[in-house]
Amino acid sequence: MAKKWLNKVKWDDNGLVPVIVQEVGSNDVLMFAFMNRDALQRTVELGEAVFWSRSRKRLWHKGEESGHVQKVHEIRLDCDEDVVLLKVTQIDSIACHTGRHSCFFQKFEGDVESGDWQTVEPVLKDPSSIYAAKP
C-alpha cells in the first residue's frame, strides 16, 4: 500500500526530489542532494540521512564510508511540495567529501568583470584519510 505522505511529494520525471541539508543549531547549509521514494522512506526509518546517488545509481547512506553520518531531527517539505529540507546533526562536523564542514565553502567575491570564487572554509580533515582503503 502506498504511503500517503510519500505521495504528497512532487517527484520529478526521474522520481527524484532535491534535498537541502541544514545543520540544527548553526543553521548552516551543509549540502544539497537528491532523494527518491526509497531514500526518503529509509531516512524516516533510520533517523539518518539516506540519499539517491545519481552517479552510483544506488541508495547512499550519508557517512557509510566516512562515518560522517547525519542524524535527522526534522524533515520539511516546501510550499510547492517539490523540495525537501533536512535539519540534521552532522557527526564529526564534516559534511563535504573535501573534508570541510559544508559543501558550500566557495564564496563569490568581486564584481561581474573581475570576480572569482574564493575558498572561505578550512579543510577539517584530509579527505585521503577519510576515504582511505579499508582492509
Curated annotation (Swiss-Prot):
Annotated organism of origin: Cupriavidus metallidurans (strain ATCC 43123 / DSM 2839 / NBRC 102507 / CH34) (Ralstonia metallidurans)
Subunit record text: Homodimer.
Residues the entry annotates as binding Zn(2+): 79, 96, 103
Family to which this protein belongs: Belongs to the PRA-CH family.
Localisation per UniProt entry: Cytoplasm
Keywords per UniProt: Amino-acid biosynthesis, Cytoplasm, Histidine biosynthesis, Hydrolase, Magnesium, Metal-binding, Zinc
Name the record gives this protein: Phosphoribosyl-AMP cyclohydrolase
Biological processes, Gene Ontology terms: L-histidine biosynthetic process
